[in-house]
Structures are given as C-alpha cells and as structure tokens.
UniProtKB/Swiss-Prot annotation:
<keyword id="KW-0548">Nucleotidyltransferase</keyword>
<dbReference type="GO" id="GO:0003723">
    <property type="term" value="F:RNA binding"/>
</dbReference>
<keyword id="KW-0539">Nucleus</keyword>
<dbReference type="GO" id="GO:1990817">
    <property type="term" value="F:poly(A) RNA polymerase activity"/>
</dbReference>
<comment type="similarity">
    <text>Belongs to the TENT family.</text>
</comment>
<dbReference type="GO" id="GO:0045596">
    <property type="term" value="P:negative regulation of cell differentiation"/>
</dbReference>
<keyword id="KW-0963">Cytoplasm</keyword>
<keyword id="KW-0808">Transferase</keyword>
<dbReference type="GO" id="GO:0005737">
    <property type="term" value="C:cytoplasm"/>
</dbReference>
<comment type="subunit">
    <text>Interacts with BCCIP and PABPC1; the interaction has no effect on TENT5C poly(A) polymerase function. Interacts with PLK4; this interaction leads to the TENT5C recruitment into the centrosome.</text>
</comment>
<keyword id="KW-0694">RNA-binding</keyword>
<dbReference type="GO" id="GO:0005813">
    <property type="term" value="C:centrosome"/>
</dbReference>
<dbReference type="Pfam" id="PF07984">
    <property type="entry name" value="NTP_transf_7"/>
</dbReference>
<comment type="function">
    <text>Catalyzes the transfer of one adenosine molecule from an ATP to an mRNA poly(A) tail bearing a 3'-OH terminal group and enhances mRNA stability and gene expression. Can also elongate RNA oligos ending with uridine molecule, provided that the sequence is adenosine-rich. Mainly targets mRNAs encoding endoplasmic reticulum-targeted protein.</text>
</comment>
<dbReference type="InterPro" id="IPR012937">
    <property type="entry name" value="TET5"/>
</dbReference>
<keyword id="KW-0206">Cytoskeleton</keyword>
<dbReference type="GO" id="GO:0048255">
    <property type="term" value="P:mRNA stabilization"/>
</dbReference>
C-alpha cells in the first residue's frame, strides 16, 4: 500500500503537454537568442535547441552521461500557460548529470565554454580563443555549489535585454522551486530526439509526447495556481533569501495568496531568511539592484511599484531584527525607489506615492537657508550583521 501511495503521488506531479503547449515549446527552443559579447567580441546567435544538442553531445564525448535535459522556470511556465503574468525572462535549462568530484565540475565548465566556439561567426580565428577568454566575453554568472545536500553548477550567458541563457548542471539539489507557479520543469529529451531523427516538420498530427513535471508535487494544483495567478508553497522554512524578492514580484503582477493566514507566516519566514542570507546593507543593495536589472529589464515602470510592495512586506513582516537595521533596509529600498523615479523622470500614480520627507521644525526659522548643496550618493559600508537569532 505504501508503494502504491508513493506511486500515486509521483504520478500526480507529471502531465502530458497538449499540442498548443508543445507548439510553444518548439517556438522557445528554435527562437534565435543573441548572446552579447563584451568589448569587441561579436554577438552569438544561438537557439536553445542548438546549444543543448551541442553541450549534451560534447559532455557525453567527455564521459559525462546526461540523464535528461529540462526547461525550467519562467520559460516552462510560459510554455504551459501563455499569458500567465510572469512573462518569459531567463531561459533556464537543467542538465541532470553526476558531479562526484571537482574534476567533473571543471570538465562541465570547459565543455560549455568550448561549445560556444561553434556559434562564433564565420571568419573568426577560433584557434586563438581560449576557454578563459570565452568566459570573460560571454559569461554573465558562474556558480558552483557543493554541500551535503546540493551539488550543482550554473553558467549564465549574457543577454543585454535580461533574457540570459542559463545552463544548470545538477547532481543533487534540495529544493528546486520557491512557489507552485515556478515549480514546473519540461523534459526535453523526446523533442530533442525528434529533431535528430525526423525528416518531417513538427505539427499537430505529428509530434512527440512531451512530459511536464511540477516539483511542487501536484501538477494540476500548481497549473491551476499558474492559470489563476495564485501564490502557494510548501515547507516555506526551506525557501532561501531570494524568495522574498520573488514573492514581491508575484504581488506586483497581481498574484494573490491562496490562504491569507498562511501567507503572513510565509512573509515572516522570507523576511528572516533574507536578512540571514544578506546580512549587511551592501549585500542587500547589490542583491536588489541585480534583481531589478534581471527581472525588470523591459518593465521600467513596474520597478517603483515593485519596490513599494517589497518595502511594505519588509516593514510589516520583519522580525528578529534590530530597529536601526530594519530602518536602514527600509531607507535603502526607499532610496532605490526614488532613484527609479528620477531615472524615468515620471510622477507615479498619487495613490501609490509614499512620502519619506517631512520638513524639520527649524525649516520655519527665518534664518534657515534652503539652498541645496549636492553631495556624493550615500553609500553603506557597515559590515556588521543586521539580524538577530529568534529566541
């Protein structure tokens, strides 16, 4: 009975994609995505299909077996529900591989970098370009994680419009989602096999069976959340610090909690985790600026509303934090919001404006000069922690 129950739960997490979804998946995999080079390096014109096939082939030639390849994140959500409110930001690909030692991590990195040579324009002398040079030219982010529960690496290829191509090589990972709506993964192997073997174009009456999986556990429930813009999760204590930023992003896109009481607990968890993972103000500033750049690249007018929502959540749900440090973070968010308004040279909707300035009593003094002297931007340099343990 236990085995049957486990099988039922496993089956609930999978679903077969319909033709509309397969068609959108085909569009995502065959769309040309520019990878922008730094300096004088040329732009690479790639498709996800080509980069996956190239990297997979080279990995297996190097002795690293790829168990499967999956489309993850907002791109997978876009395939399942076209107008879901999340858009299609980074193009996340997951390669399931074994990474038992440092040698495999290094080999994976070298294979990906060398694969980029295939996409350089004709006429470029590839013999003089080393993997290190390619990394400096085209890699936005390079991450390696090795812990008791997580063994994975990430190579993010640069796109100036925020649509980075992210190649993630996973041996093990404890948690692969934050909310039900971002828990989807689409297994690409059957479609990749179709591209390799079929002489006929893909069509409604001639296409492979493609399987999607929800890491949330219940595919239909998560799919309903995505269709109806609902916020739900499981084991919120496992969500890392970036979950607070993702949660605020969902709110600004008109997603709403499935359970208001549970969400209040979730907000407290996420705020606490944010301050644990990003303990000083400089780290918080870098994280926020990077998040805005990556997730609002083509949505400048949403940045202010996003920061106001984030500020409200931090203000209302932060616990285990010294008052001064809490105010410091709130001031940081406020300054970023004001900078956004200055950059856009716009006046926000008055109903959404929050005033952070009240004239001091001495301003009414007749001898007070209101002449403003410009100073360099305020920077935060305190390296001390901004959180206290809960007792």
């Amino acid at each position: 009975m236990a085995e049957e129950s486990s099988c039922t739960r496993d089956c609930m997490s999978f679903s077969v994609l319909n033709w509309d979804q397969v068609s959108r998946l085909h569009e995502v995999l065959t769309e040309v995505v520019p990878i922008h080079g730094r300096g004088n390096f040329p732009t690479l014109e790639i498709t996800l299909k080509d980069i996956v096939q190239t990297v997979r082939s080279r990995l297996e030639e190097a002795g690293i077996k790829v168990q499967d390849v999956r489309l993850n994140g907002s791109a997978a959500g876009h395939v399942l529900v076209k107008d879901n409110g999340l858009g299609c930001k980074d193009l996340d690909l997951i390669f399931h591989v074994a990474l038992p030692t440092e040698a495999e991590f290094q080999l994976v990195r070298d294979v990906v970098l060398c694969s980029l040579l295939n996409f350089l324009p004709e006429g470029v002398n590839k013999l003089k370009i080393s993997p290190v040079t390619l990394k400096e030219a085209y890699v936005q982010k390079l991450v390696k994680v090795c812990t008791d529960t997580d063994r994975w690496s990430l190579i993010s290829l640069s796109n100036k419009n925020g649509k980075n191509v992210e190649l993630k090589f996973v041996d093990s990972i404890r948690r692969q989602f934050e909310f039900s709506v971002d828990s989807f993964q689409i297994i690409l192997d059957s479609l990749l096999f179709f591209y390799d073997c079929s002489n006929n174009p893909i069509s409604e009456h001639f296409h492979p069976t493609v399987i999607g999986e929800s890491m949330y556990g219940d595919f239909e429930e998560a799919f309903d959340h995505l269709q109806n813009r609902l916020i739900a999760t499981k084991n919120p204590e496992e969500i890392r610090g970036g979950g607070l930023l993702k949660y605020s992003n969902l709110l600004v896109r008109d997603f709403r909690p499935t359970d208001q009481e549970e969400i209040e607990t979730l907000e407290r968890y996420m705020c606490s985790r944010f301050f644990i993972d990003f303990p000083d103000i400089l780290e918080q500033q870098r994280k926020l600026e990077t998040y805005l750049q990556n997730h609002f690249a083509e949505e400048e007018r949403s940045k202010y509303d996003y920061l106001m929502i984030l500020r409200r959540v931090v203000n209302e749900s932060t616990v285990c934090l010294m008052g001064h440090e809490r105010r410091q973070t709130l001031n940081l968010i406020s300054l970023l919001a004001l900078r956004v308004l200055a950059e856009q040279n716009i006046i926000p909707n008055a109903t959404n404006v929050t005033c952070y300035y009240q004239p001091a009593p001495y301003v009414s003094d007749g001898n007070f000069s209101n002449y403003y002297v410009a100073h360099p931007p305020v920077t935060y340099s305190q390296p001390y922690p901004t959180w206290l343990p809960c007792n």
